[in-house]
Structures are given as structure tokens and as C-alpha cells.
Amino acid sequence: MKVTILQFPGTNCEYDAQHAFKSLGAETEILWHKSDTIPSDTDLLIVAGGFSYGDYLRSGAIAKFSPVMKAVIKYADDGGKVLGICNGFQVLTESGLLPGALKRNESLHFLSKHHHLKVINNENIFLEKLDKGDIVNIPIAHHDGNYYIDDSGLKELYANNQVLLKYCDENGNDKNPNGSIDSIAGICNKERNVFGLMPHPERAMEAILGSDDGIKMLQGFLRA
């Protein structure tokens, strides 16, 4: 399996993602944002976390104009699998590949800690190794992680089973760290080939670092 990981100026999680997928046995390649094509042997495209272009204007707002994003959109439209993590999620919403937007955290502070998530829908390649209702402990690290979508968009997300993950406590009860509508932490598109989440599963690969729950989250892609 080949995983291609995008790198923008200001990206800082590309090597975390590379380490995570290499540890699962995947081949990886880091792709600079000036490329106008996606490698033809790519099975999964990662839009990694960080602060692309310094988060000027809005998080992800400038990255969407990078040359590589036209290729990303075509890759996704052709059915290619795309995962946006943290800033990558922001880039995917700004680019129109995922609905909604990411706003400043309700507290107006940067958050960096482990937080529990509940699996809402596992009928997709991303979370198929987990069961609906499972609780995982995954790091979060963001300033603009407050997911927003209007009422009609929210209804559509639920109608199409696009809500994948919600923030919760260790018992699965609602616990919202950033003000995200309905405590939403991760979603997918209608076609279930584009995924985005604010938490960092690639940083939860070893128990000694606090959690290895990211392994099951990312393993689903290995059959790609």
C-alpha cells in the first residue's frame, strides 16, 4: 500500500503521519505542495496537520490555492481516498471536499491534550476496524477546531451517516472541548472516500506515549 502525504509551508505533522503508516507496513512518500500531480500509485492521500501558510487569513484558507490542491480535488472526485487530519481537515473544508467549516475554539485558547472520542459510524474504510460506540483516546492539538455547519447541513450529515466521531468522556458521555456543533470531531463526504477529523490518530500509535488507539483507526485503510 502506498500513502502519499502532502507538505505545505508550515505543515508539521507529515513525519508523524509517515511514521504511523510505516509502522503499519505501508510505503510512504511526502509530496511538496508545488506538485501538480498525485503519484499514480497512491492508495491513500494524507493532508497532514500543522499550520499551512502560518494559518494566515483562516486555517487552510491559503493552502487551498496551492498547485497540488487541484490534483487533490481531481483525485478525490475520481474516487481516491483522502484523509485530512487537523489542519488537513481545515484545508479539505476550505477546498469544498468536506462540508462545514472550522472556527476558533470556544475558549479562544490553543488546546493540546488527549481527549476521548466515540465512534458514531463505522460503515466506512476509515473506522471499519472499530465498532459503533467504541471509545478511543486520541490527542488533540488545535486553536481552530470548533466545527460548524448550518442546520440544513447538519441534518444532511446525519441523514447520510457522515458524522463519524464525537468528543466524549471516558464513559462515552458528551464532553466538548472546543464548542464544535453536536460535539462533532470527524466527518466524511457522501461518497465515503474523503475523511476529516481534528484529533491526531497518527500521534496515538504507541501506548508508551499515552495511547495506541490510533492503530485501529488507521488500519482500515490498509486494505485500500
Swiss-Prot record:
Its EC number is 6.3.5.3, 3.5.1.2. The keyword Glycosyltransferase does not apply. It catalyses: N(2)-formyl-N(1)-(5-phospho-beta-D-ribosyl)glycinamide + L-glutamine + ATP + H2O = 2-formamido-N(1)-(5-O-phospho-beta-D-ribosyl)acetamidine + L-glutamate + ADP + phosphate + H(+); L-glutamine + H2O = L-glutamate + NH4(+). InterPro entries: Class_I_gatase-like, PRibForGlyAmidine_synth_PurQ. CDD domains: GATase1_FGAR_AT (cd01740). It holds the Pfam family GATase_5. GO terms for biological process: 'de novo' IMP biosynthetic process. Keywords: ATP-binding, Cytoplasm, Glutamine amidotransferase, Hydrolase, Ligase, Nucleotide-binding, Purine biosynthesis. Transmembrane segments: none annotated. Residues 2-224 form the Glutamine amidotransferase type-1 domain. GO terms for cellular component: cytoplasm. The active site is at C86, H200, E202. Part of the FGAM synthase complex composed of 1 PurL, 1 PurQ and 2 PurS subunits. Part of the phosphoribosylformylglycinamidine synthase complex involved in the purines biosynthetic pathway. Catalyzes the ATP-dependent conversion of formylglycinamide ribonucleotide (FGAR) and glutamine to yield formylglycinamidine ribonucleotide (FGAM) and glutamate. The FGAM synthase complex is composed of three subunits. PurQ produces an ammonia molecule by converting glutamine to glutamate. PurL transfers the ammonia molecule to FGAR to form FGAM in an ATP-dependent manner. HAMAP family: PurQ. This is Phosphoribosylformylglycinamidine synthase subunit PurQ. The gene is purQ.
